[in-house]
UniProtKB/Swiss-Prot annotation:
Cofactor: Mg(2+)
Pathway field: Metabolic intermediate biosynthesis; 5-phospho-alpha-D-ribose 1-diphosphate biosynthesis; 5-phospho-alpha-D-ribose 1-diphosphate from D-ribose 5-phosphate (route I): step 1/1
Entry-linked Gene3D superfamilies: 3.40.50.2020
Gene name of the record: prs
Keywords noted in UniProt: ATP-binding, Cytoplasm, Kinase, Magnesium, Metal-binding, Nucleotide biosynthesis, Nucleotide-binding, Transferase
Name the UniProt record assigns to this protein: Ribose-phosphate pyrophosphokinase
Keyword Metal-binding among record annotations: yes
A Pfam family that the UniProt record links to this protein: Pribosyltran_N
InterPro entries the record matches: PRib_PP_synth_CS, Pribosyltran_N, PRibTrfase_dom, PRTase-like, Rib-P_diPkinase, Rib-P_diPkinase_bac
Length: 340
């Protein structure tokens, strides 16, 4: 039941709905916006098909459908598609698919012949279902937002994470080196270094067999990290093979400490054990996907992405600028970092 409606221009109503993957994040976003999540009836039939129905009218509303594409990923995507279809048929004024983690984003190009570009397919499915706009956090490749025929708000968690790291290393930022886990993300590492005061950069050279998923070998460090507090930054940690290997290589190269930072903590299979035993001082993630208690440990810090999502949703609803959020963050939302 909606107890409050965010008022924008006349005759505009904002409604937030959520799938079943990460309702806690939706509740946190709603709290930031000063509204409640619209109640939704959703359940599975015996054969695995899903049913969705909204308990109140959405006619003429600007609706934001929050669903992280997390395990079971195909079910998560399908549920969001069904939710969007129901909104379109119920005459919602506009529909924004809020996908903190967009599924299949790593399959954004063909490595070999006869392969799909699954990321493009997900964008096409969202458009066909009725999404007018997509909002996501740290796509694996920023250019993949061009797959969608419509506006895409590509949010970045870097301000949230940098704010935390700056606080953790207060007084010692001059000894921080930013490290990319591979050459492909060196541009992101450069942006990190600029925000942290222009410290040194390094990257880990790795090799990957494209015929064997979730396997990469970290070979050597390119750059001087001896005696440095290394901040190892990535967009997503899945099985943690790349990150754990990079930690070991950095330690072998004489790093004083290694702090692992990533936006999406998928943490599949052996990831937790690898991260616990990789020698990292701390692992810092955001809550774009749910991280259950059994996957948490003393060395893990989870920051809330809800203030960033709420600010972006508010900007879209009020016809404001999403880009300006990142020019003024954290001053814009005034909350620093929150823990999830």
């Amino acid at each position: 039941m909606v107890s409050a409606i965010l008022e924008g221009k006349p005759d505009k109503n904002l409604i937030l709905v959520t799938g079943r993957i990460h309702p806690k994040l939706a509740e946190d976003v709603a709290e930031q916006l000063g509204i409640d999540v619209l109640e939704t009836t959703a359940y599975d039939f015996a054969n695995g098909e899903m049913y969705v129905r909204y308990t109140e009218s959405v006619r003429g509303a600007d609706v934001f459908v929050l669903q992280s594409h997390y395990k079971p990923i195909n079910k998560a995507i399908m549920e969001q598609l069904i939710m969007i279809d129901a909104l379109k048929r119920a005459s919602a004024r506009s529909i924004t698919a809020v996908c903190p983690l967009l599924g299949y984003s790593r399959q954004d190009k063909k490595h070999r012949g006869r392969e799909p570009i699954s990321c493009r397919l997900v964008f096409d499915l969202l458009k066909t279902a009725g999404a007018d706009r997509i909002m996501s956090v740290d796509l694996h490749a920023a250019q993949s937002q061009g797959f969608f025929d419509g506006p895409v708000d590509h949010l970045v968690a870097m301000p949230v994470l940098v704010d935390y790291i700056r606080d953790r290393f207060q007084g010692h930022l001059d000894n921080v080196a930013v490290v990319s886990p591979d050459a492909g993300r060196i541009r992101v590492a450069e942006q990190w270094a600029q925000r942290l005061g222009g410290g040194p950069l390094a990257f880990v050279h790795k090799t990957r067999d494209i015929t064997r998923p979730n396997q990469a070998v970290a070979n050597r460090v390119v750059g001087d990290v001896a005696g440095k507090d290394c901040v190892l930054v990535d967009d997503l940690i899945d099985t943690a093979g790349t990150i754990a290997g990079a930690c070991h290589v950095l330690q072998d190269a004489g790093a004083k400490s290694v702090t692992v930072v990533a936006t999406h903590g998928v943490l599949s299979g052996p990831a937790v054990e690898r991260l616990k035993n990789c020698g990292a001082r701390e692992v810092v993630l955001t809550d774009t996907v749910p991280i259950p208690e059994e996957k948490r440990w003393d060395g893990l810090t989870v920051l809330s992405i809800a203030p960033l999502l709420a600010s972006a949703i508010r900007a879209v609803f009020e016809d404001g600028s999403v880009a300006e959020l990142f020019d003024t963050y954290p001053e814009h939302h005034g909350q620093g970092f929150l823990f999830a």
